[in-house]
Amino acid sequence: MLKREMNIADYDAELWQAMEQEKVRQEEHIELIASENYTSPRVMQAQGSQLTNKYAEGYPGKRYYGGCEYVDVVEQLAIDRAKELFGADYANVQPHSGSQANFAVYTALLQPGDTVLGMNLAQGGHLTHGSPVNFSGKLYNIVPYGIDESGKIDYDEMAKLAKEHKPKMIIGGFSAYSGVVDWAKMREIADSIGAYLFVDMAHVAGLIAAGVYPNPVPHAHVVTTTTHKTLAGPRGGLILAKGGDEELYKKLNSAVFPSAQGGPLMHVIAGKAVALKEAMEPEFKVYQQQVAKNAKAMVEVFLNRGYKVVSGGTENHLFLLDLVDKNLTGKEADAALGRANITVNKNSVPNDPKSPFVTSGIRIGSPAVTRRGFKEAEVKELAGWMCDVLDNINDEATIERVKAKVLDICARFPVYA
């Protein structure tokens, strides 16, 4: 018999220890991976609820199983909030991840072998935008576009490639691009050849929800996002569209269920509903504004300390440090900063001479530290410590000094107070 007092700590000490250690790690390390964030306790409450017990294949009002009257309410709340938040008239909240949302878009709009124009992974794109190791690169004919010498998207090149290759779909969005994308320009290019414009806004969804970054929903045929990252919700995906094309909406729904997934994760959808409601609050806008301010403040310090920032700055929540001139690899920088309790990820930079497993850069993002309460003063101090480590990458004494400062500031700015 199940009892409410059952717990992991008493039953599975080995697992509980790992969970507790991860909790400590999150509190005692500064998180600068651009795709990571902290959910609210409300989101975690939803994800730990009895909704995890319920199978609900289908969509609200059209389920294959009985007993769905209350999970229908949960999913409809998430759908309605997603549409309201992003100005869409269609939303599917069932994708288990951003990659699965993207997979659904491909299968809804394309046939295997169709040509797709997507951002080059080495210049800021994402695996699902055409990498040869991903389904997108294996099933479709991918033509990559990239950035110009200033580090900005080269729309002239994009237009030229579109005219030459006649892709059926053009993908906007990125995983490591610090600029503002001109969604209207991309739609203009897509329309010029009769292609779909599909935007993956996963990295900037929170900024978009707060009005800090341009919204692609009015311009794209289809938009996807994750619900974590800047949106600060549970790990999951979301598909949005606007324009009233009911046939398109049916294709998208079918591409999620029954094509790619079976039963939706109702406890995660409840978490999405909570996060979407939180994103409508005034304090969420203040938070996202601070995310952008903090990223700019960090860039300023790195530039002043002689580090090269790809594109020379940032207009969103992330930026790339190019370490080629410092004769450092991204792998070395990642490891050294990690020893100082600062978590980043190695990342390829434009024209990177190193392999993706080594790289010549690191990606830095401000969402998680801003969630802790860091403002410009704190992130500038943090960026200075990072420069100290990178300037003395083999000096363990410097790394230990920085680690002590990190532990102190983490104690002053806890993740969960």
Curated annotation (Swiss-Prot):
Localization per Swiss-Prot or TrEMBL: Cytoplasm
GO CC term, one of those recorded: cytosol
Top-level EC class: transferase
List of residues binding (6S)-5,6,7,8-tetrahydrofolate: 121, 125-127, 355-357
Pfam families with a match to the protein in the record: SHMT
GO MF: glycine hydroxymethyltransferase activity; pyridoxal phosphate binding
Substrates-to-products reaction catalysed: (6R)-5,10-methylene-5,6,7,8-tetrahydrofolate + glycine + H2O = (6S)-5,6,7,8-tetrahydrofolate + L-serine
PROSITE patterns: SHMT
Main localization category: cytoplasm
E.C. code: 2.1.2.1
Pathway linked to the protein: One-carbon metabolism; tetrahydrofolate interconversion; Amino-acid biosynthesis; glycine biosynthesis; glycine from L-serine: step 1/1
Gene Ontology BP, a term: tetrahydrofolate metabolic process
Keywords assigned: Amino-acid biosynthesis, Cytoplasm, One-carbon metabolism, Pyridoxal phosphate, Transferase
Superkingdom assignment: Bacteria
N6-(pyridoxal phosphate)lysine modifications at: 229
Residues annotated as site: Plays an important role in substrate specificity: 228
PANTHER family assigned to the protein according to its UniProt record, in alphabetical order: SERINE HYDROXYMETHYLTRANSFERASE
Family affiliation: Belongs to the SHMT family.
Function: Catalyzes the reversible interconversion of serine and glycine with tetrahydrofolate (THF) serving as the one-carbon carrier. This reaction serves as the major source of one-carbon groups required for the biosynthesis of purines, thymidylate, methionine, and other important biomolecules. Also exhibits THF-independent aldolase activity toward beta-hydroxyamino acids, producing glycine and aldehydes, via a retro-aldol mechanism.
Protein name: Serine hydroxymethyltransferase
Native source organism of the sequence: Salmonella typhimurium (strain LT2 / SGSC1412 / ATCC 700720)
Organism classification: Bacteria, Pseudomonadati, Pseudomonadota, Gammaproteobacteria, Enterobacterales
